[in-house]
Amino acid sequence: MKILVIHGPNLNMLGRREPEVYGSVTLDEIDAALRERATAAGATLLTIQSNHEGALIDFLQAEGWDADGIIINPGALTHYGLALRDALAMLKAPIIEVHLSNVYRREPFRHTSVVAPVATGQIAGLGWRGYLLALEWLLEEKRA
């Protein structure tokens, strides 16, 4: 089983950027927790973080065709990343959109996701554990 984890712009700054909003856990810590759980389940986890939409699209085009699941936190690309949305739409794997904060309790511009219409589901506001919940769902979905 192959799971892709995609982290969009500014997520490399987790732990330093607005910890009152995003928490104090770093991206490396999130990826380590996901990798530990995936390995225990016999799954392969491939991760990427980029501040550039094109790099995320290149990753999806290279790795997404045979992926069994995709976890994506598009960051600000959530609201305007149409090329990223189109790259996700090409793939057959279930997609879980994750947001650390509850975007619906924040500024109005954050309430719209161009990714949501192509995602299987969305988890928002549960902090870094939202990634783990997404992974658990994907692992269970493939066992069903």
UniProtKB/Swiss-Prot annotation:
Superkingdom of this protein's organism: Bacteria
Name by which UniProt lists this protein: 3-dehydroquinate dehydratase
Top-level EC class as recorded in UniProt: lyase
Organism of derivation: Roseiflexus sp. (strain RS-1)
GO molecular function ontology, one term from the record: 3-dehydroquinate dehydratase activity
Site residues (Transition state stabilizer), renumbered to this chain: 17
CDD domains: DHQase_II
Catalytic activity: 3-dehydroquinate = 3-dehydroshikimate + H2O
Functional pathway: Metabolic intermediate biosynthesis; chorismate biosynthesis; chorismate from D-erythrose 4-phosphate and phosphoenolpyruvate: step 3/7
Family: Belongs to the type-II 3-dehydroquinase family.
Record gene name: aroQ
This protein's UniProt keywords: Amino-acid biosynthesis, Aromatic amino acid biosynthesis, Lyase
Signal peptide: none
Protein role: Catalyzes a trans-dehydration via an enolate intermediate.
EC number(s) on file: 4.2.1.10
Quaternary data: Homododecamer.
An example Gene Ontology biological process: quinate catabolic process
Binding site for substrate: 73, 79, 86, 100-101, 110
Alphabetized InterPro entries for the sequence: DHquinase_II, DHquinase_II_CS, DHquinase_II_sf
Catalytic center residues: 22, 99
